[in-house]
């Protein structure tokens, strides 16, 4: 060891070389598990065998977020500062005026000077007032889907086109250069700035270096840029040749997106249960990095791949309303049209003498789990978390810091506010597609999506009310009435409400005959003439 040298110290250049060559890489415990079936493909991201992200794609329901279309403006709504564009779907896409204006780079991106020394005259500034004149009704417009159809709403689109690659994002109509702020090492950022300025990006276009570009060689960026420029050339060709509406660039399928978005240097292994898909993935990765190609493995086990890696049970738990925490507390997640509500409870965690410590521990674990569940369930929009009340402002700050730190792993943009005086934390999460639950479930035909049905007591009251009306109306003609109900309601009628039914028979000099039908909805009953079978109405 040289005098004054720190133990285990590695010169910066040596560290960079080792990172590029993959020497001494430590296991991160992160792996991708991919299941390929005829109707559905599924990707699970595991960190130390814990499910962190889960994506599904079905053959009949392909993802369109990121796809580029040549659309036609159908109508303009100045009142809501938006227009509706036909891009070939049942519902027209929604284009807000500010999404039709050239945008600045996101706050998560550091803007880099191109360094070409050519002072270019700035283009006239466009405002939302100019949009109707630029894109009148009937005109063609090049757009990209930024948010897929959710519920009864059509896709949301933008004219701010971007093509994401493995290491770069190409912006054909934005000449800015940028580097992801998630790359924090100052020396690495300086190295990437130099590479960025040396890239041969066509005039008028810009590029952003993605987080995954940290530690990568210059040639990887050159190769990635070449692929993106070729993609853009195909878009331009389609723009000239195809009539609107037309799809000019289709967002890659789940396998290709997994290579682009998930397969980073932090991923130890990719395990996939389909030989053809594994080979295709290796070929895709091989275009960029031969070293990363070795991490892709074909699973040949007899047991289903998601069961083998413990994914299935974790997916099932992802649909539960209540999620338990290690300390014994739990959170409750309710997904509504307007917002996502999360409630935090101490649950079984009540035995500690120091209640403040118990509450802090529960809230800290809840902060971790809330961030994980948002990503896992792919829920976004407005989220309000009701934490257990903390008197100490320092404890509130600790919970706020914890959830902010945990959300750094999330690719979706998030914005979090500190805990309010009411103990509520408000946050937003970017919502590009429908949630996992919305993709998997449909509204319950029994409760119409409410999640509740009327109790047997309520149904008994409503039935007795109906019997009074029916028997009063038909008492001169019908003397025997058949009542068909669900077994749960019949059980209530024969026990708690038997005297009330006898009173009805006495009052109208008639006879009631009850029949249970297990196929009936719990809220359904039928009153009919026992002799003719004709249904009786009040």
Question: Where does each model-flagged region fall?
Answer:
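Charged, low-complexity terminal tails
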Residues: 1-157, 533, 538
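Charged, low-complexity intrinsically disordered tails
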Residues: 1-9, 177-312, 319, 433-538
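P-loop NTP-binding catalytic core
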Residues: 45, 56, 95-115, 121, ...
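Conserved glycine-centered short motifs in functionally critical loops
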Residues: 81-83, 87, 91-93, 148-171, ...
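Loop/turn-to-beta-strand initiation segments
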Residues: 137-140, 243-244, 295, 339, ...
């Amino acid at each position: 060891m040289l005098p004054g040298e720190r133990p285990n110290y590695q010169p910066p250049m040596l560290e960079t070389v080792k990172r590029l060559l993959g020497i001494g890489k430590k296991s991160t415990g992160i792996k991708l598990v991919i299941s390929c079936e005829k109707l559905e493909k599924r990707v699970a991201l595991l960190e130390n065998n814990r499910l962190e992200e889960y994506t599904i794609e079905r053959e009949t329901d392909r993802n369109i977020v990121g796809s580029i279309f040549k659309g036609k403006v159908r109508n303009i709504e100045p009142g809501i500062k938006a227009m509706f564009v036909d891009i070939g779907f049942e519902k027209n896409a929604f284009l807000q005026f500010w999404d039709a204006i050239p945008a600045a780079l996101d706050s998560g991106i550091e803007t880099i000077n191109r360094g070409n020394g050519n002072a270019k005259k700035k283009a006239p500034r466009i405002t939302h007032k100019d949009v109707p004149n630029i894109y009148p009704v009937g005109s063609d417009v090049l757009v990209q889907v930024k948010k897929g159809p959710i519920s009864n709403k059509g896709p949301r689109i933008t004219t701010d086109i971007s093509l994401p690659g493995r290491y770069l994002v190409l912006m054909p109509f934005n000449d800015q250069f940028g580097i992801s702020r998630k790359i924090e090492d100052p020396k690495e950022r300086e190295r990437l700035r130099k590479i960025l300025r040396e890239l041969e990006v066509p005039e008028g276009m810009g590029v952003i270096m993605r987080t995954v570009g940290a530690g990568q060689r210059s040639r990887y960026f050159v190769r990635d840029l070449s692929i993106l420029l070729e993609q853009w050339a195909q878009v331009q060709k389609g723009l000239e040749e195809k009539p609107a509406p037309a799809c000019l660039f289709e967002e890659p399928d789940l396998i290709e997106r997994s290579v682009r978005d998930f397969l980073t240097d932090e991923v130890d292994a990719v395990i996939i249960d389909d030989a053809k898909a594994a080979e295709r993935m290796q070929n895709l990765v091989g275009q960029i990095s031969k070293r990363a190609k070795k991490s892709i493995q074909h699973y040949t086990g007899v047991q289903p791949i998601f069961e083998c890696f413990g994914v299935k049970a974790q997916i099932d738990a992802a649909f539960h309303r209540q999620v338990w925490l290690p300390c014994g507390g739990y959170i409750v997640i309710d997904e509504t049209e307007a917002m996502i509500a999360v409630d935090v409870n101490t649950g079984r965690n009540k035995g500690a003498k120091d209640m403040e410590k118990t509450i802090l521990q529960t809230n800290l674990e809840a902060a971790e789990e809330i961030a994980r569940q948002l990503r896992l369930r792919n829920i976004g929009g407005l989220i309000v978390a009701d934490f257990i009340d903390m008197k100490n402002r320092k404890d509130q700050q600790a919970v706020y810091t914890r959830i902010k730190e945990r959300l750094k792993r999330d690719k979706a943009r998030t914005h979090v506010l500190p805990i309010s005086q009411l103990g509520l934390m408000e946050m937003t999460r970017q919502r590009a597609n429908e949630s996992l639950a919305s993709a998997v479930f449909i509204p319950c035909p029994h409760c119409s999506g409410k999640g509740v049905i009327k109790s047997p007591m309520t149904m008994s009251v409503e039935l007795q009310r109906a019997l009074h009306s029916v028997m009063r109306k038909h008492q001169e003609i019908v003397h025997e009435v058949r009542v068909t109900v669900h077994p749960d309601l019949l059980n209530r009628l024969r026990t708690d409400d038997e005297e009330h039914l006898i009173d009805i028979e006495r009052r109208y000099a008639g006879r009631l005959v009850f029949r249970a039908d297990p196929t009936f909805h719990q809220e359904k009953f039928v009153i009919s003439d026992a002799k003719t079978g004709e249904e009786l109405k009040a």
